């Protein structure tokens, strides 16, 4: 093989390597680029993974951890909503929901998180969401097989209002800030 042929082979291998690496990088989903059909972007909750714990809950099919951004945590600590005041603008809640499974390691019966099911979010922004008490709602479903998120099929910023209207007196928030 002469020098020119080796150069062509090397260039071809390099181009193929760049294509493969680029394809892998592109296939990794950036969840923060997602938006609900109503326009609420996942990026509104960027950093939710590091928010403080508000509470936990369990339904028959989900284990849930409710997290809050610094704005809502400060509001809870000041007595909201128990003092009759509404949560301030910019308050945000993230509910991380897993499918449960029985622990095979614990010496007692306990449900532990299995696969992530979905993420549910609330955001206080009275200008953007005046028709729902100032709160916007979003849910993104997680597909463990592809490790990707998709906007929930209900997909509108008002999808959570139907349930949360039951706690209007607590500014539409179900979970109290639990004692630590």
Residue ranges and their predicted role:
Residues 1-8:
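Positively charged n-region of N-terminal signal peptides that target proteins for export
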Residues 6, 41-42, 71:
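Polar low-complexity intrinsically disordered regions enriched in Ser/Thr and small residues
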Residues 8-9, 26:
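Short hydrophobic transmembrane-like helices used for membrane targeting/insertion
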Residues 10-21:
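Bacterial N-terminal signal peptides
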Residues 21-28:
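Sec/Tat signal peptide C-region and signal peptidase I cleavage site
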Residues 28, 32-60, 84-180:
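Sequence context surrounding c-type heme c attachment/ligation sites in exported
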Residues 65-83, 104-107:
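N-terminal post-signal-peptidase region of extra-cytosolic proteins
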């Amino acid at each position: 093989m002469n020098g020119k042929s080796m150069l062509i082979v090397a260039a071809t291998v390099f181009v193929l390597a760049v294509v493969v690496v680029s394809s892998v990088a592109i296939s990794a989903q950036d969840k923060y680029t997602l938006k609900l059909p109503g326009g609420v972007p996942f990026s509104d909750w960027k950093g939710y993974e590091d928010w403080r714990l508000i509470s936990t809950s369990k339904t028959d099919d989900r284990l849930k951890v409710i997290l809050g951004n610094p704005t809502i945590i400060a509001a809870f600590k000041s007595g909201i909503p128990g003092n009759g005041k509404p949560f301030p603008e910019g308050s945000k809640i993230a509910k991380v929901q897993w499918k449960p499974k029985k622990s095979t390691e614990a010496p007692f019966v306990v449900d532990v998180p299995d696969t992530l099911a979905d993420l549910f979010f609330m955001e206080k922004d009275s200008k953007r969401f005046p028709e729902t008490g100032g709160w916007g709602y979003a849910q993104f479903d997680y597909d463990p097989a592809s490790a990707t998120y998709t906007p929930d099929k209900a997909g509108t910023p008002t999808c959570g209002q139907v349930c949360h209207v039951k706690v209007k007196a607590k500014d539409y928030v179900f979970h109290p800030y639990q004692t630590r």
